[in-house]
């Protein structure tokens, strides 16, 4: 059997024609465990929906989050969904995200939707204003929070959060929806470090592959804006 010994991701890539990934270095988040971190989270009542954006070149991505406190007053992080665009500019992609949000959460008050990103999305370039600046104008009127989100401290914060045990309320502190396949693949190793080479010091820096890193950067932006403050100033 030609498939013997292959991982599910490799089978998906070779047989099903899906993107998939072939591990080419240690995962950025080795503490991610499918049985503990994948489930069916929903958006709790009276909780803002966080859309975290990464405007990757020709591959923009957005992830949908909820950050909420349980009856034990502990912070929880639910990763509800994600979208990406292939060979599409930021503005048409954003219009699709806005339309999808209305379909997926039809009763959600628009005032309960918050948008976050990295400061790079606001930079003016030779082609004009950054997408964050454009989307702040009519007809979109998105109110972005954005700041410089360095990779290493963000990755470290997420790693530490993934290591937390099940909460005293009985629920996982972090849960990603099982339908968000590319995000799960990213956590499992699609988003990875460079492979170590004998005799050479390899900097612990996530690989930029133009696919998984865009999804995972958006997740890091969401955490920087809405998780870090909860950890610094708990309850």
How would you describe each model-predicted region?
Residues 12, 223-224, 228-230:
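Charged phosphate-binding loop/patch that engages nucleotide di/tri-phosphates or the phosphate backbone
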Residues 66-72:
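Short acidic-glycine loop/turn motifs at beta-strand connectors
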């Amino acid at each position: 059997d030609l498939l013997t010994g292959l991982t599910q991701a490799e089978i998906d890539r070779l047989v099903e024609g899906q993107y998939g990934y072939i591990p080419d270095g240690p995962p950025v988040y080795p503490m991610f465990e499918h049985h503990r971190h994948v489930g069916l989270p929903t958006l709790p009542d009276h909780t803002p929906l966080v859309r975290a954006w990464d405007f990757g070149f020709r591959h923009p991505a957005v992830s949908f989050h909820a950050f909420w406190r349980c009856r034990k007053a502990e912070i929880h992080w639910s990763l509800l969904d994600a979208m990406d665009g292939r060979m599409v500019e930021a503005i048409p992609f954003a219009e699709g995200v806005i339309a999808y949000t209305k379909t997926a959460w039809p009763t959600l008050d628009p005032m309960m939707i918050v948008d976050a990103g990295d400061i790079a999305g606001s930079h003016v370039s030779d082609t004009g204003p950054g997408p964050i600046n454009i989307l702040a104008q009519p007809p979109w009127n998105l109110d972005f929070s954005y700041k410089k989100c360095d990779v290493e401290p963000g990755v470290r914060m997420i790693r530490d959060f993934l290591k937390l045990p099940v909460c005293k309320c009985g629920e996982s502190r972090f849960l990603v929806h099982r339908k968000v396949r590319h995000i799960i693949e990213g956590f499992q190793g699609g988003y990875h470090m460079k492979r170590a080479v004998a005799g050479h010091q390899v900097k612990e820096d996530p690989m930029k592959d133009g696919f998984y890193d865009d999804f995972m950067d958006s997740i890091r932006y969401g955490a920087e804006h809405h998780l870090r403050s909860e950890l610094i100033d708990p309850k």
